[in-house]
Amino acid sequence: MIRMLRFGAKALAVLALATLSQAAAAGGNSTKDTPAEPVERGVYFSGYDVVTDSRYTYSGIIVALNGDMGRDGFFARAYGAYGNFDQNPGDGRQWQGDVALGYMFTRSSIGYEIYAGVDYQNVRLRPDDPTAEVRGTEWGFKVGAGIETEKELPYYFRLEGNYSTAFNSYWARARVGVNRGRFTFGPEASVVGDEDFDAQRVGGFVTFDVKLPQFRPMELTLSVGHQFVSGSNNNTDGTGGIGGGEGTYGLVNLSVTF
């Protein structure tokens, strides 16, 4: 009887070890077959905007302070831009940069972000015009916010904007569209201005992924439409100003996560 109990105990031990070994092997194969996606710590973006009598180049970076853009948390943001524009007479140059701290969170497949920081703007006119409302250097307080649907949804919506006390400048844009595989497209509308001008844009956009070997997927956005202007930019001679004149606009934007 004792021998039978010992034999049974040994058999159970062998069976338990075999079961654990199979479970460990299965777990190892599962991890190997479905590797975890890399965590996105931030995003870099850059673009070029052109409209009648105005050219504008910008770059920026957003970094999640918790190390994961997919989680709720604080982020740091830096942005810089350079523009040149034609006026009557002469031309002008514009430099702008800001640094900000913000918070992002997701609820029901919709992402939200808010941020605030310090803004720097410098505008130089040639020839100089002492009567111009937007001229010289100004520091200001900048606030911004955005809302965007997640990419997994069949439809797309994004609303974003910001305001700075430097020259009372503002910008806002709304996009609605549909997601079709790698492509997202639809209409867009935006407003931009400062103490010197106001402009409104209506057009369309398309966004798609660009995949290159050894690189993370990049997102490219193209948009085109018409700009309407008022204020000092609405010159009778057709020459624009700091925000450009009335006419066709085009935008190229590239973003990549890291």
Language-model-derived ranges and their functions:
Residues I2-L12:
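Bacterial N-terminal signal peptides that target proteins for export
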Residues L20-S21:
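N-terminal signal peptide c-region/cleavage motif recognized by signal peptidases
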Residues A24-N88, F228, T236, Y249, ...:
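Short glycine/proline- and aromatic-enriched beta-strand/turn motifs that initiate or cap beta-hairpins
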Residues G27-R41, A64-F75, T106-Y112, E150-Y156, ...:
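Short loop/turn motifs that connect adjacent beta-strands in outer-membrane beta-barrel proteins
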Residues F74-S169, A189, V224-T248, V256:
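Outer-membrane pore/translocation modules
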Residues Y170-R175, G186, S190:
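Conserved binding-pocket/active-site segment within a compact domain
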Residues G181-F258:
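Predominantly the C-terminal beta-signal and adjacent terminal strand-loop region
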